[in-house]
Amino acid sequence: MSKIISVGISEHKVASDPVVLVTYGLGSCVGIALYDPEVRIGGLAHTLLPAPVREVQGAERTAKFTCWAVDLMVEELLKCGCAPERLVAKLAGGATMFEPQYRSAHGGIGERNVAAAREALERSGIPLVAEDTGGDYGRSLEFNTATGIIMVRALQQPIKQL
């Protein structure tokens, strides 16, 4: 059985050994997985918000913000031996967890997190190969870096494989 590494809210982890990266309770948050299938190295981020509301200095950049999570993981993945042209992405979460009256004119947090993730991936030239986003339910993810497979678990929903 593979070692399990938990990725908390606003965190990202990169693993160069075969492990299972897990994150729990993705509601409007987004889980972004990056993977290099040739070297079997991957990373997982659990992002909270699309972007900061004020300018933040470089040292303060964290995976709390979806707009930065991809860049932070790519930087670490390249140090571990990944090639940028081999990276692929999978995305899950971004649910609508609150009633419509609590959403802004730009959509709910979940929708904006998904949009920010897609923009960051496009900016980095990383193809999005699978996703399970939206809906009105939370998700938990298990990302096996030996296979690149993500198991998506949600209450009263069938288990999905990305």
From Swiss-Prot:
It is an enzyme of class 3 (hydrolase). The keyword Hydrolase applies. Its EC number is 3.5.1.44. It holds the Pfam family CheD. GO terms for molecular function: protein-glutamine glutaminase activity. Keywords: Chemotaxis, Hydrolase. It catalyses: L-glutaminyl-[protein] + H2O = L-glutamyl-[protein] + NH4(+). Disulfide bonds: none annotated. GO terms for biological process: chemotaxis. The keyword Manganese does not apply. HAMAP family: CheD (MF_01440). PANTHER family: CHEMORECEPTOR GLUTAMINE DEAMIDASE CHED-RELATED. Probably deamidates glutamine residues to glutamate on methyl-accepting chemotaxis receptors (MCPs), playing an important role in chemotaxis. Belongs to the CheD family. This is Probable chemoreceptor glutamine deamidase CheD 2.
